[in-house]
Amino acid sequence: MLCLVYLGFAARLFVASLYSDRPELSSLQRAVRLDPTNADYRNHVGRYYALVARDPATAIDPYRAAAQLNPHAARYWFDLASAYQVLGDISNQTWALEHAIQSDPATPDVAWEAANFFLVQGEDEKALHEFRVVLDNEPTMAGAAIQFCWRIHPDADILLRDVVPARPLDFYQAVGQRLACQGELP
């Protein structure tokens, strides 16, 4: 008997995964009904509303549900922040961004995306802080990050103080490697 229950449960999850791979809204909604605790399926529904139906207001609930089901996935919080941005809801966008950063505070990709959101909001200091996280954790991105930061705030003293990592040797080695690869060093 227990084996049949397990088999039924596994079959339901398998069918849900099949529905989740289809790009139609009805299939995505079926996947959510079959496996309501799967955050990915909820996020797919939100992405459908935001990107295909171009209805960011309707995307909010599925995005929020995905983020609540798995609050440690920065992607869900960024998708929610994007929907709030399109709606012009800056306070909720900032709230979602803060959760994205909390969920993954040291990953360079997360910090880079957060920095871009903050730039759009006009929050240059927060953006520079996130670029600092990028440089602290991925020195190979130093060249691109510094160029970006220079466009935001073309003041070498501020960038050295607020953006360049405390371990300058790693940073300078990464910049030197980037310049050497681009043929800008003798």
Regions found by a protein language model. Give the residues of each.
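Hydrophobic alpha-helical transmembrane segments in integral membrane proteins
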Residues: L2-S26, R30
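Residue at a conserved register position within TPR or TPR-like alpha-solenoid repeats
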Residues: Y49, Y84, F118, F148-C149, ...
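Short coil turns that delineate tetratricopeptide repeat
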Residues: L34-T37, P71, P105, D136-T140, ...
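TPR alpha-solenoid repeat register
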Residues: Y41, Y76, V110, M141-A145, ...
